Each structure stands twice: as structure tokens, then as C-alpha cells.
């Protein structure tokens, strides 16, 4: 029987699939299900009730609450939703319950089809310590575990890892023996929070290693495909940021691909694997590699493999779960190159601080597909949120900070990288901060373009790509002027005397000052820019402004001339002459004061500020406020403690990651306003440090 005939014969096996997940992966699975004529069921938390994935499913079942533990990690609630909606199969996506063997057994025991590997295979790989023993016995190269009591200075750095972990959570690099205990404790806390299992182990940390992984697809009849490799060496906090297929390293080292595929197939056979999975390795530049783990699920980065093979990996998951054989002895050959960038709601310049709030606009050019392909050169966009005029997307604090995956495919690596860089640079990403600038800087970096990368790329060797924005100071000033011109046009259009220009005088020039903060939010003066719009009544030169560094900017035209309505989402086009060169900028104004300015100079997000600062917004010296909403997981000081600049005061967990709050000055802790377990919002007072320098200044003032 051919594969097509098998599919026709087995179609009744799966008729309605529930996806026990959220966001872009739920939308990805729904796409394949719809292509196959299957009915779809979503489950959603209260926070997700208006998300696209919940609207797109044929049926959606509420999981009361917001926290993962009461919603997407609540196995009983998910199974009850499947029963109520009449689902006969469950796809777990990735994360949440996808690698929970107990949940897989419960699905099967309920008479439903589990679209994933067997519970036994998940169990075998669920503990990284036990998995390493199995892999070593199967002949797969491994790194040995280290005993805490035996670790010496000469063995550093070492890596603390969660045995049940993944996604970078529960991982800590230790570089000094003094840090070993505290970093191990932090890894245990993260592991318990993310996976419900605080077991950790320690192994040697390879500083300049490269993360290489092999995509597996196996059926229940002994067939195993090593579909292709991916390189995921660009990471922050041990989480992948940019992935690509194939790997530049594997392409360069003779015979490495064959050895990788042989090891991956051996791993699959050792545990009787079926379905989609990934064998991850740590490699050096010589092509030597060591086993890291088997992810017993679909990976976030699976689109780059789909783009380079033409396969629908989710469709193959359905087929394997329905009992089909793999359609051929070997997978398709690799074709071209694909690169994926993960767009996160976070601030790389401030220790990857997660951002919550509103995404006002999220538009990309050159998108040829979403959740499939691409099968032609172009951009694939797999996004969780969607925006529309007057309907921003809201990013909360309960779930992962990833907004979307942007994937490019082209015949060559150079073309794929260039295409992705251009798409990200031109994208209209307005609202809360993202890592878009960092992604473009990485893709444009000479070493990245040459394939000279490793897992320390962001944290050690190329830190500047995370700290330097795409738009320089002059570009920010030019963009702010364009925003001010549109603001002036809006003001003119709403006055009764609209045909008399704002600030017009019979003699001399009229000057209007507009104030902006760079970024989304109220910000502060240090991150602000003031723009003077000068109109002359004595010439036809129109509005003009002279910026710093003696650059001259003159308005040529603004369309529409009477401004834009903030609520409609319609942009204004501003043509400026910058040092004699014409530039076209697109300006979107939003309710609440947000302004997105996009041009070939670079993207700039601004927030309108009042002409004069509100004294109530000024934070007292020595006061530390929460930079993000989250939960206080530990407090390391007490009132009266002497602290030094940079000393850890407490940690906050937000979006599944821990973030350290450190002292900003030397001094004495005079107040602690937060305790372990407190739920806090952005701007909440956490602590106050009395600085000797501040006291001296006060005394001098009093005298």
C-alpha cells in the first residue's frame, strides 16, 4: 500500500485534534490539521481568550486562570477539555506538557491518540543524567558528570543543568568556586518552577562550543530518519536566538554530517523512538561532538528544516501517530539554506529584561507563507499575536516572551541571511521593546556572515551587537523631527483656525518644542530627545530644524497634510531633506502617545512626553523600583545591611526566567518593601539604599 493509500485508509483514526498549547505553535499545528481536513480544538487561559489561536480553532475550551500550573500545565483540565470538545487526538506542541510522560500515558489511557513519542521514550530521556548513561551505552559520545565536592579551580568553568530541563531554564555557568553554591541553588529554583523537578547535575563547560542538533523522524515500525542538522549556536541565557539549516560547521568539516546522523539514529534506536524528536550535541571547531540531550517533541526551530527539505514535520507527526510507515527509506536531500530569528519581547541592553505591555503594530514585508514552507525564496512568519488598527496585542508576564519566528529561505546562506536581515530591519514593530535591533546586528556581523560563531557569541565575543541600537543619535533626532512635523499637522487640523499655521507670527520665526522618550513608555529625560520645529514667515523654506553635529534637516512634504487619526492606524509619510539628501519616513501615531517612525535610516520607537516633567514621576535617589512585573523569588539582604554597587539584593522571576536586582550605589539598606513570594508590577518600590555620598550632599545643602 502506498503512503497516500495508507493515509486514506487511516483518515478516520484522527478526526479532531486538540492542541494542548498556545501562541504560534498552536497556530502551526492548526494549519496542518486544516490542510488535512481535521477539526481543531484550542484550550486557552483567561489571559489568552482573545488571542488569534483561540479564535482560529473550530472549538475552544477555557482553562480557568492564568498561571501555567492552573491552565496549560493542568493535565486533568486539558483532558477534560478534550472530552468535552469531542477530540480524539492531542498534540502537545512544545513546552508545557509536551515532555511529560505521565500526561502522555493519561492521554492514551483515555482512549485518545497521543501525537508524540511513547511515554517510555519520554521517560528514558526525561532525566538528563539517566539519558547520558543510555547514550554512552549506545556508543554516542557524552560529557561525564562532575561531583560538586570534587570540583576545583582548574576544572572551571562548569555548567549546572536541570535534569528535567530545557529552553535554557535551570542552567547556570559557574566561573568561580565562590559562586558554585549560589548558582546551583538558583538553577534548582528555576528547575522547580519550570519543570516541577529541582534535580540538577554539573558538567564541564565548553567555552567556544557550537550547538548542533539533528532532526529525527521515526515511525513505529523501526524506520528512522535523520532529516538534517541545524546549528543553534547563537544563544542568550542558554536559549536559542538564531537557528539555521544546514550548519556552517558541518558543511565545512568532512564526514561530520555522516557521523552526526549515525549517532542520532543510534540514540533513536536505543530508546525505541517514534515521532518527531531532536538529538542535541555540543561540538568544537574540529568536528568533535558530545551528546547533550534528546528533546522528545517538535522543536521551536523546526521551520528551518521544513524549508530546506520541503517536509511538513507536523504532518509526519500525524502520520506516525496514526500508525503509518515513513514514506521512504531516506528523507529528502537538503535544498538551499534557511535561517530563523526569534523575536522576543525583551531588552537585550538591560540583561534581557522581559517586556510586557502592548504591541501596537507587527508587520513584515516580503512574507510568502505563514506556518508552512516557504517553498520559494522569501520570508515565512510564524507569529503568536496579531495587531490591527485600534486593536493592539497584549503581552503578559505568565508565559514565554517570544512573539514570533521569522524564517528566510534562499539558495545560499549569504542570500538567506541578507534576506532575513532586510526583513527585520524594514519590519514595523511598534510598541513594547523587542530584540529586533540585536537580531539585525547579529545577522550583519562579519563573523556571523562568515559562519564563525559559537555559544559565547553574544555573552563574550560580540557583546556590542546587544548594546548598540540600529538607529544612531542623529537618526533618532531626524525621526523625532518627522514625528514632530506630523504632530504639528495634527494640531493644525483640529484647531478652529486651521488655515493659520500653529505658532505663526507676523514677524520673525515661530518655534514649537516637542519632547519624546526613545522607546515605549514614560521613560526619563536621560533617554529623551527634544525637537524644535521652526517655521519662518519670511521665506518659503517651510519648517526646518538644525540638529546636533551641524546636520541640517528641512521638511519637503508631509502626506496627508492635515495629519493622521491615531485610532485608524493610517500612517503619515514625511519627506525630509537631510544634509541635502532626501529621506522618506513613515510615521504611525497611536493612542497613549506612542509614535513609530520607520525609514531606511533605521526604525525608531518614540513616546510623546509632556512639555514639563511631572515632579511626582521623579524617583528618589537610592530607591530601587521593579523594572518589570513578576514574582520575588529570593531576597538576599536585610534592613541595615551594608551593600556595594552591583551586589545582588533580590531576584524576580518573570516570563520563566530569573532576573537579578542589584545595588546601584554603595550604602546601607534603609528599607525593604518587597518579600519573597510577592507579586509586583513595573515601578513597584523594592528597596531604598542610603548612600554616604548623598548624605554628604544633603549636609552641605543644609549648611
Roles of regions detected by a PLM:
Residues 169, 245, 400-406, 620-622:
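Short amphipathic alpha-helical segments
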Residues 538-542, 548-583:
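Conserved nucleotide-binding/hydrolysis modules and their immediate coupling elements
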Residues 1-279, 283-302:
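N-terminal beta-alpha lobe that positions the nucleotide/phosphoryl donor
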Residues 582, 586-626:
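Catalytic P-loop NTP-binding/switch module of NTPases
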Residues 303-306, 311-552, 645, 678-703:
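Catalytic cores of soluble metabolic enzymes centered on carboxylation/carboxyl-transfer
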Residues 615-703:
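Structured functional modules or segments
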Amino acid at each position: 500500500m502506498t503512503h497516500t493509500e495508507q493515509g486514506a485508509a487511516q483518515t478516520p483514526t484522527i478526526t479532531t485534534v486538540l492542541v494542548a498549547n498556545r501562541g504560534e505553535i498552536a497556530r502551526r499545528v492548526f494549519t496542518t490539521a486544516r490542510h488535512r481536513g481535521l477539526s481543531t480544538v484550542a484550550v486557552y487561559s483567561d489571559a489568552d481568550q482573545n488571542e488569534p489561536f483561540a479564535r482560529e480553532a473550530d472549538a475552544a475550551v477555557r482553562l480557568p486562570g492564568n498561571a501555567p500550573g492552573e491552565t496549560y500545565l493542568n493535565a486533568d483540565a486539558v483532558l477534560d477539555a478534550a472530552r468535552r470538545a469531542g477530540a480524539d487526538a492531542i498534540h502537545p506542541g512544545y513546552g508545557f506538557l509536551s515532555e511529560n510522560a505521565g500526561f502522555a500515558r493519561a492521554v492514551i489511557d483515555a482512549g485518545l491518540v497521543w501525537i508524540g513519542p511513547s511515554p517510555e521514550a519520554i521517560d528514558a530521556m526525561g532525566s538528563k543524567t539517566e539519558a547520558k548513561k543510555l547514550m554512552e551505552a549506545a556508543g554516542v559520545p557524552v560529557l561525564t558528570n562532575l561531583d560538586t565536592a570534587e570540583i576545583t579551580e582548574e576544572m572551571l568553568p562548569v555548567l549546572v543543568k536541570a535534569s528535567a530541563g530545557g529552553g535554557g531554564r535551570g542552567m547556570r555557568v559557574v566561573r568561580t568556586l565562590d559562586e558554585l553554591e549560589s548558582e546551583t541553588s538558583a538553577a534548582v529554583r528555576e528547575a522547580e518552577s519550570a519543570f516541577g523537578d529541582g534535580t540538577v547535575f554539573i558538567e564541564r563547560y565548553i567555552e567556544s562550543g557550537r550547538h548542533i542538533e539533528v532532526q529525527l523522524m521515526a515511525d513505529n515500525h523501526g524506520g528512522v530518519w535523520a532529516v538534517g542538522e541545524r546549528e543553534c549556536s547563537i544563544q542568550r541565557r542558554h536559549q536559542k536566538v538564531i537557528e539555521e539549516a544546514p550548519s556552517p560547521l558541518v558543511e565545512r568539516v568532512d564526514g561530520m554530517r555522516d557521523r552526526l546522523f549515525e549517532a542520532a539514529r543510534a540514540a533513536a534506536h536505543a530508546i525505541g523512538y517514534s515521532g518527531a524528536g531532536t538529538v542535541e550535541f555540543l561540538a568544537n571547531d574540529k568536528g568533535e561532538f558530545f551528546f547533550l540531550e534528546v528533546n522528545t517533541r517538535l522543536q521551536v526551530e523546526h521551520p528551518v528544516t521544513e524549508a530546506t527539505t520541503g517536509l511538513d514535520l507536523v504532518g509526519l507527526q500525524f502520520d506516525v501517530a496514526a500508525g503509518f510507515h515513513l514514506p521512504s527509506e531516506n528523507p529528502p536531500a537538503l535544498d538551499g539554506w534557511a535561517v530563523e530569528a526569534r523575536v522576543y519581547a525583551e531588552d537585550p541592553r538591560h540583561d534581557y529584561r522581559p517586556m510586557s505591555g502592548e504591541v501596537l503594530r507587527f508587520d513584515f514585508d516580503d512574507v510568502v507563507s505563514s506556518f508552512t514552507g516557504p517553498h520559494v525564496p522569501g520570508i515565512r512568519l510564524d507569529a503568536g499575536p496579531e495587531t490591527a488598527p485600534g486593536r493592539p496585542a497584549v503581552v503578559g508576564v505568565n508565559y514565554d516572551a517570544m512573539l514570533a519566528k521569522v524564517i528566510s529561505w534562499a539558495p545560499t546562506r549569504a542570500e538567506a541571511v541578507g534576506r532575513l536581515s532586510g526583513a527585520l530591519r524594514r519590519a514595523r514593530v511598534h510598541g513594547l521593546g523587542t530584540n529586533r535591533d540585536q537580531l539585525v546586528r547579529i545577522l550583519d556581523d562579519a563573523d556571523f556572515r562568515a559562519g564563525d560563531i559559537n555559544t559565547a557569541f553574544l555573552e563574550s565575543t560580540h557583546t556590542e551587537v546587544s548594546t548598540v541600537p540600529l538607529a544612531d543619535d542623529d537618526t533618532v533626532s531626524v525621526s523625532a523631527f518627522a514625528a514632530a512635523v506630523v504632530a504639528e499637522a495634527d494640531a493644525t487640523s483640529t484647531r478652529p483656525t486651521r488655515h493659520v499655521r500653529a505658532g505663526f507670527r507676523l514677524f520673525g520665526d515661530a518655534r514649537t518644542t516637542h519632547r519624546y522618550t526613545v522607546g515605549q513608555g514614560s521613560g526619563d529625560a536621560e533617554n529623551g530627545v527634544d525637537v524644535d520645529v521652526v517655521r519662518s514667515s519670511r521665506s518659503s523654506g517651510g519648517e526646518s530644524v538644525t540638529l546636533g553635529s551641524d546636520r541640517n534637516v528641512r521638511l519637503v512634504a508631509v502626506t496627508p497634510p492635515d495629519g493622521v487619526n491615531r485610532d485608524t492606524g493610517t500612517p503619515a509619510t514625511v519627506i525630509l531633506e537631510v544634509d541635502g539628501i532626501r529621506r522618506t519616513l513613515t510615521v504611525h501615531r497611536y493612542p497613549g502617545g506612542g509614535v513609530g517612525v520607520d525609514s531606511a535610516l533605521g526604525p525608531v520607537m518614540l513616546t510623546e512626553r509632556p512639555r514639563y516633567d511631572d515632579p511626582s514621576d521623579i524617583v528618589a535617589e537610592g530607591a530601587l523600583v521593579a523594572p518589570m512585573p513578576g514574582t520575588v523569588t529570593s531576597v538576599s539582604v536585610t534592613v541595615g545591611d551594608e551593600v556595594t554597587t552591583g551586589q545582588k539584593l533580590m531576584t524576580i522571576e518573570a516570563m520563566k526566567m530569573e532576573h537579578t536586582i542589584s545595588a546601584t550605589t554603595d550604602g546601607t539598606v534603609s528599607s525593604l518593601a518587597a518579600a519573597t513570594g510577592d507579586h509586583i508590577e513595573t515601578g513597584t518600590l523594592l528597596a531604598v539604599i542610603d548612600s554616604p555620598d548623598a548624605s554628604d550632599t544633603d549636609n552641605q545643602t543644609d549648611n
